[in-house]
Amino acid sequence: MTKKEIAHINAKIEQYRKWAAEEAAEARRATDDGERDEHRLQERLNDSAADTLELLLSELS
């Protein structure tokens, strides 16, 4: 992989982590259980996407 490709993947990982943190904050502010659950699900999905990209990056390096 080129340095540019690695940098791009790392940027995506950071973006997914940021989105996960934003969803966690939204879940804390949610006023009903359904909204809270949806934000927690989105948080987990974003965190999983970041984990998957990290694993891919480590396997390709």
Segments (PLM) and residue ranges:
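Conserved catalytic/binding loops enriched for acidic/polar residues
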Residues: 4
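Short, charge-rich amphipathic interface segments used for partner binding and complex assembly
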Residues: 8-61
